[in-house]
């Protein structure tokens, strides 16, 4: 199916955001908003979001990929994935405004873009959203961070000669020891929950 791509701009809390809308001649009733992950913009690594959008548009879906505030060509301060709900809501709005036949929107997100989509839907229960496609969502909790630090940092640190020298000479602070013990306990608690 043939489609047309066009640059679109829209306003979110006073800032102008930019995106690319790929729209087939006769779009399906459900459209897709691509939510990028990490510090990327609407093209994506190796043009992955361009290729994805074009493939979906050729299959009959209207697709909007856009830059959050502070990323790519969009204005405003840079956002983290847990602070882009307004951007996502505005993107859905412009998509439905530009393609009035669209009744529902599916959010497609990669990595922390997937987490942003999930958080958006959880926070808003937006009735316009009828689907989520979440690829590799990224979530960090205190317990998962502690487990990662114990596994990757502290294990390696115990093998370093200078650590043992600092410990033996009394240069390791009480705060560091307490932090290590707390993180080890958190990591152990998480491991017990997973088993």
Model-assigned labels for residue ranges:
Residues 1-30:
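N-terminal cap/lid segment of alpha/beta-hydrolase-fold proteins
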Residues 106-109, 135:
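Short beta-strand immediately N-terminal to the catalytic nucleophile in serine-hydrolase-like folds
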Residues 108-117:
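Gly/Ala-rich beta-loop-alpha elbow adjacent to hydrolase catalytic centers
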Residues 127-195:
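The alpha/beta-hydrolase serine catalytic core
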Residues 39, 68-72, 139:
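Alpha/beta-hydrolase active-site loop signature
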Residues 24-67:
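Short, surface-exposed "cap/lid" segments of acyl-processing enzymes
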Residues 71-104:
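Catalytic nucleophile-loop/oxyanion-hole region of alpha/beta-hydrolase
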Residues 119-123:
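Active-site signature of alpha/beta-hydrolase-fold catalytic machinery across serine-
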